[in-house]
Amino acid sequence: MSKTHKLVIFDTETNGFRGSSVLSVSISIIDAVIDNKLNLESFLKVVDFNRFYYPVEFEYDAGAYEAHKLDKERIDKLRKEHKGPPYPEYFLQDEQIANVFKDKEALFIAHNIAYDRDLIRIPLKKTFCTMLSNAKVLKIPGPYKNTFKNPKLIETAQYYKVIKDEQEGVFHESKYDTELCALIVWRMLKSKNIELLTALGYTEEEIFKATQY
């Protein structure tokens, strides 16, 4: 019998480093259907969010701006282009988004999820990090002997062949990064990645049986 898993894949852009305001959040909620042999049957986006907020800080961080180009003028423009109902000006006031992150059944996924989790300020029950889980998959040499560095999103995407080199210029947009992370997760499920299947609740015995040929 097949089982449907709810995945919440997300990314944020901020006004600086840890503890600063969230300027944008992008979320893709996906139903992943997996059969009893742990084959991925379908990977369907149910709903997505792409929202922009103002910082509570008095200034926009120059270093962060260089990465994502979000300032008051651009945020004004992007909020005006939003076609759905209006939403709060500040991230921590957005109850609809907060309710998404309060889901106790979903698996929350991000690249470097520890960083994003701190910004949300809501305990996430089940999480998975595409960065940490792929360090030993990509095996990019780390700074010390016999270590691997944590791969960047672009490095992970290139490994799973879900990005072309000429697409690099569009990075640091939360919407694009979320879509790219979703493609990485799709590839990982297709290949029956053990860490991801474990995060979804499958037992060691189930995974062993499904990965034997």
Predicted feature descriptions by range:
Residues 2-124, 154-159:
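Conserved non-catalytic scaffold segment of RNase H-like nuclease domains
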Residues 12-15, 130, 181:
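Ser/Thr-centric signal marking residues that sit
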Residues 53-54, 130-132, 162:
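Active-site donor-binding loop signature of nucleotide-sugar glycosyltransferases
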Residues 59-77, 135-179:
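Active-site-proximal helix-loop-helix substrate-binding element of RNase H-like nuclease domains
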Residues 104-114, 119, 152-213:
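Acidic, Mg2+-coordinating catalytic module of metal-dependent nucleases/exonucleases
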Residues 125-139:
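Conserved beta-strand -> loop -> alpha-helix junction used to position metal-binding or nucleic-acid-contacting
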